Each structure stands twice: as structure tokens, then as C-alpha cells.
């Protein structure tokens, strides 16, 4: 069988503070929305197009997101895509999310200092 790769790398801005919950087993999970932008030519000008990505972080990365990630922060994440679905009113709704395995805080609005900048890089990897 040949090997396959499912790897996503995103650099973008956090849309809102992380939504952090604890499972019944006591495991932390965080959901973060990140925006990425690109410029595309449209009628002689460049139009900016924004894409929103749903990120899911577990355990230590969820804790790091809860402690250090805020709306407006610029972050780098690596992970893999996962697809699923759920039912709502008898309709199947498809979902897509990035399961994050590495998180790096790149910058904060207004230059606020984040303690995450003092951590060694391996502390930000699951």
C-alpha cells in the first residue's frame, strides 16, 4: 500500500477567543476559528477573499489556547483535515475541521506580551 499524507499548515488571525470545554472523561478540547486571506484579480483590481477555518485542539494544546490565544492573534498551526457530519432537523450537515498538532503564537494585536512567547517551541507541540 502506498503512503498518503494529510497535512494542513495555516497562518492566520483568530476570529474569536477559543471555546474551551472539558469532556466527561476530563480531557480539554478547544475550538478556534482562524481567518486566512488571499488576493484575487477581479475586474482590473485585487479583491481580498477571506476563508474561515475551524480548528480543534486537544489536551495540552487546548490548555495553551485557553491560556494564551485571543481574538486578533496571529497564529501558525499544523495539523490534519478531518471531515464528518451531524444531523439537524433530519438534514445531514457536513463538517470540516483541522485537528491541530502544533501551535505557534506569532503576534498579538497592539503588541501585548504573551507568556507563550517565553515557552520553548516543543512545549507548543502535542
Feature map (PLM): residue ranges:
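Beta-rich strand-turn-strand
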Residues: 58-93, 106
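Exposed loop/turn and edge beta-strand positions of beta-sandwich/beta-sheet ligand-binding modules
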Residues: 8, 28, 51, 94, ...
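A beta-strand/beta-hairpin structural motif
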Residues: 42-67
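OB-fold and OB-like beta-barrel modules that bind single-stranded nucleic acids
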Residues: 9-16, 34, 71-82, 100-103
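Short, acidic/hydrophobic/Gly-rich beta-strand patch recurrent on exposed beta strands
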Residues: 31-35, 54-56, 96-98
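Acidic, gly/ser/pro-rich intrinsically disordered tails
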Residues: 1-5, 20-25, 41-48, 89-92, ...
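OB-fold ssDNA-binding interfaces and closely related basic DNA-contact patches used
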Residues: 1-36
